[in-house]
Amino acid sequence: MDTNADETAAASTASEAANATPTSVAFTEQMTGFFVLGAGDPRSAYEDARVRDERMMFELTITAPDIDEFVSGDEHEGTAAGYLDSDALGGRLPVERGWFNLFVQSGDLDERIMKYRLWLTTEGGSAVTFVGFKDVRDDPGFDLWDDTTTLFVQVLDGHVPPGADVAATGLLDPADPSVLGAGVLRIRPLDFAEQMTTFTTTGPGGAQAIARFGGLFLGRLWSTYGRLARQDDA
């Protein structure tokens, strides 16, 4: 019996199995801000909601189930799970289904659109969809920190599925009757630093997977904050 051959074959099989196992990356994000019903434009709605002290926040775990597909795919699609808490919508609402997309403009990492879509049901039993986007530009003419930490949001009537246009923000015209309300959420600096420590992985090559995801998600900010998310491979 050729023991060496058996050991070599077993090692090869194990290596192939490891390579076939997708590596996932996940992190937890918390954003807070203000939201008001009866408005459609996030910026003006934010000011109105702030005066009224109509608060909104969410805590979401964003997951890329397969880092290879997430990085190479056109839609860079992941999942979002967690909850949203809104004064205007009746309190804390669990996310029934959630999407996260990161669209890279023309393959240029200096311009990215991050999109969030959450299906929720209000305390009164109404189905609604939370949609939000960050427009992130790394060029010197824009405030990169503000872009990365600001989410413009609307809440739509019903459970609305994602559209086919991956480059679109997901928000509707402010005058669209489907828009129930709008506002703006932000990440505070200390919360952002805490967010960077929540990165986890499953599967092989965890440290490399986090670096690939982080570079795509944060662009130039990754060189500053990526050290907080470092993970040593076992």
Stretch-by-stretch model annotation:
Residues D2-A234:
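Beta-strand-enriched cores of mature, soluble protein domains
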